[in-house]
Amino acid sequence: RLEKLGVIEAIQFSEWAAPIVPVVKADGSIRICGDYKLTLNRVARIETYPIPRVEELFAVLRGGEKFSKIDLSSAYQQIVLDEQSRPYTTINTHKGLFMYNRLTFGIASAPAIFQRTMETILQGCQRTCVYFDDILVTGSSNDEHLANLDSVLCKLEGAGLRLNRAKCAFMLPSVEYLG
């Protein structure tokens, strides 16, 4: 499935192939990750980026009347890797070697890369919190909330990012965030 979606592609040789590790997700499905602690993470210069503190997030949300929670579908895998980084993300599977064309879990820099990317995309969006793949939008009135939400959705669409509609919630008096 990942190959058909262009997330990974088969290759013949790699000096960086990492073994795979299956991770059970909250919904019971399996996520395949590379065990990069044995390869890439040992030698890579780890990218850092400040992650917002919970206090900062709640300061943005304070006074919000209603809240909209936005969930991206396979969030990391929507971020395209540059060409020269791809060979380092190779995984070794029972079906052969595959390199990632998209950001993947297990790479030590992935959370920082993702946070920076999302904050850059949503820069200028008012009353909006981004904590990795958790996006929350509010406003002190319905009109303000809808304007803020429209701004966020337009920027996500402009960046080509897809939502997981089943996990999104709009205009609610309260939502679970960071839970």
Q: Language-model segments: what does each one mean?
A:
Residues 1-179:
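Retroelement reverse transcriptase polymerase core
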